[in-house]
């Protein structure tokens, strides 16, 4: 095997210096980063279906038979109150064939529990099965930091940056001089050819198809890891850099004054709790539907000692992409609207901040986008393998 000759190959005739250097770096960095990229892509593929797998293993609790009328929310409130339990939150799915999910505080055991309830019969379906929770926690940790804490987090971040360079340098190496050849190379795989030729076409063609999507997934990943990446993204979307945000918070601004005013109002609401009769959950749901009239999964957080208001998040999918966009509204205990924080009214950089995780994981459009992301990350997983096979053939 002539490894040295391959790693330090001579520049070809008519090959530009830029393409020559790109080729060497693509090879060296590919060999160096392949193992980490394999782990990150594989765990990303596996983690993509976490919610779907959890729903499947708890299918007897999650999915129920639909009937004509749902029970009022007050039924569940009264039912739990009789059992010395106090509701903290309630999730009402958009899909009528899914159970209501209620988190409640058990006064006797002093524990917070989450159970599925049939919205048509009122039956308590239990807390479900969490057998895969530990597995997915490990998969997530491997994906984020290779089970090595902060050190692993930075290792993953560096190699994702390397992967981004690999994608771009791969495009440089792949780009043909002739336009006719461009179309042929971009969209064809010679399936009847020999193994090494098919492997070569898979590396090039699948890499071309997935390039933009893998770049996007990679950037949204390192956005979480590195503040400077977050700054670049936010500034490019019209926001402030992280340092500028910190500096602006040091002075008294209108937004700070508004925040203080909001906090004072909440403190006054806490003091008035005894005098105010709390309206029922069904009224809150009615008011929510009045403010946010579209169909969508709704989560209601009930008031407590620290938070005197109802906080409602409703997922809006009424857009041309079907993306899951969160709208948030607050009501006080007597049903007066105190805050309306609609996704469509937020600046672009703030919208991106709120959607950065579902954009990275593929949950942004539900199961369809999760499947698409799975296929893209599967291609990302294959690139180091097919690339290594190409290199191995040359050194044999």
Where are these regions (language model features)?
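Conserved histidines in hydrophobic membrane contexts and catalytic metal-binding motifs
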Residues: 2-396
């Amino acid at each position: 095997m002539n490894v040295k000759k391959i790693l330090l190959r001579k520049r070809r005739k008519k090959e530009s210096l830029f393409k020559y250097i790109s080729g060497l770096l693509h090879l060296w960095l590919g060999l160096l980063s392949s193992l980490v990229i394999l782990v990150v892509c594989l765990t990303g593929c596996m983690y993509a279906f976490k919610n779907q797998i959890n729903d499947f293993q708890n299918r007897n609790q999650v999915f129920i038979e639909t009937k004509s009328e749902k029970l009022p929310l007050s039924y569940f409130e009264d039912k739990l109150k009789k059992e010395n339990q106090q509701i903290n939150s309630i999730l009402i799915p958009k899909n009528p064939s899914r159970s209501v999910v209620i988190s409640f505080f058990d006064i006797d055991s002093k524990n917070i529990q989450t159970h599925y309830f049939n919205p048509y019969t009122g039956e308590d379906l239990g807390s479900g099965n969490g057998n895969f929770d530990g597995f997915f926690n490990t998969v997530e940790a491997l994906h984020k930091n290779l089970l090595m804490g902060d050190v692993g987090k930075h290792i993953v971040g560096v190699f994702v940056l390397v992967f981004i360079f690999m994608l771009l340098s791969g495009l440089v190496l792949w780009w043909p001089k002739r336009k006719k050849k461009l179309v042929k190379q971009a969209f064809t795989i010679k399936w009847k050819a020999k193994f090494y030729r098919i492997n070569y076409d898979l590396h090039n063609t699948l890499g071309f198809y997935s390039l933009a999507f893998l770049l996007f997934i990679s950037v949204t990943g390192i956005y979480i890891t590195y503040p400077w990446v977050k700054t670049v993204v936010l500034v490019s979307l019209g926001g402030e850099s992280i340092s500028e945000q910190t500096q602006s918070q040091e002075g008294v601004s209108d937004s700070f004054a508004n925040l203080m005013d909001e906090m004072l109002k909440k403190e006054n609401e806490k003091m008035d709790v005894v005098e105010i009769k709390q309206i029922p959950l069904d009224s809150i749901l009615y008011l929510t539907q009045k403010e946010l009239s579209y169909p969508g999964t709704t989560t209601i957080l009930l008031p407590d000692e620290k938070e005197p208001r109802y906080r409602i998040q409703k997922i809006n999918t009424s857009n041309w992409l079907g993306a899951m966009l969160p709208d948030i509204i607050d009501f006080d205990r007597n049903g007066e609207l105190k805050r309306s924080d609609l996704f469509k009214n937020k600046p672009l950089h703030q919208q991106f901040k709120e959607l950065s995780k579902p954009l990275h994981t593929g949950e942004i459009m539900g199961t369809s986008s999760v499947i698409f992301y799975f296929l893209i990350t599967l291609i990302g997983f294959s690139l180091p393998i097919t690339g290594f096979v190409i290199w191995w053939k040359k050194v044999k």
